[in-house]
Amino acid sequence: MIVMDYHLIELCRAGDSSAIEHFVQTYQQDVYRLALSILDDSSEADDAAQESLLAALRALDSFHGASSLKTWLFSITVNICRTRLQTQKRRERLRQILGGILQVTRTPSAEESTIENESGQAIWRAIHGMDEKHRIPIVLRYYHDLSVAEIASILQIPEGTVHSRLNTARRQLHEVLKEGRS
């Protein structure tokens, strides 16, 4: 673990408000981007990011430095996002049952609009069309530049499984993009 991270963690554990503020400022953007890339909803991502940072601060005593602080925090974020996705699926089922009465249209945020307008628009849509088990490793690897070892740690799966899921996801992307050009 980096000495600066260790010092920051110790200050946060002691309740130092400036250290807590520094922790949040340091990791908030990365956590938000990860949540947005998983949830594809800026409001949900903002809530998930706040929840992740708060959960991490509350659980600092359980952080032992086996992985980097960022990897540990990303693990918390992925778990919170998974819970939110399950909740979204339940809500969606309820909406379908109620015949769309509860459906609400949302306006994309500026960041979402930028992502949608970039040249990778087709790739982004294809990634979000994947199931969670393949989407999350792709997002962590290519949008957050994490190593296979870090992804394995976050998802609590063997590195070989990460490699396999990445390969499967790349094949799926290739097929979807190939069909889109036809």
Segments the model singles out, each with a brief description of its role:
Residues 86-89, 130, 135, 170-182:
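Short, Lys/Arg-enriched C-terminal cap helix and immediately downstream tail that follows
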Residues 13-22, 32-51, 159, 181-182:
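Short, charged helix-capping/linker segments at alpha-helix termini
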Residues 4, 125-136, 140-161, 175:
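Helix-turn-helix DNA-binding module
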Residues 33, 47-54, 67-79:
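Structural recognition of an alpha-helix C-terminal capping motif at a helix-to-coil junction
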Residues 27, 165-168, 172:
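Residues within the DNA-recognition helix of helix-turn-helix
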Residues 2-5, 91-120, 147:
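Internal acidic/polar
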Residues 61-64, 75-96, 116, 168:
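Arg/Lys-rich amphipathic alpha helix in sigma70-family domain 2
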Residues 13-14, 40-41, 51-68, 88:
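Sigma70-family region 2
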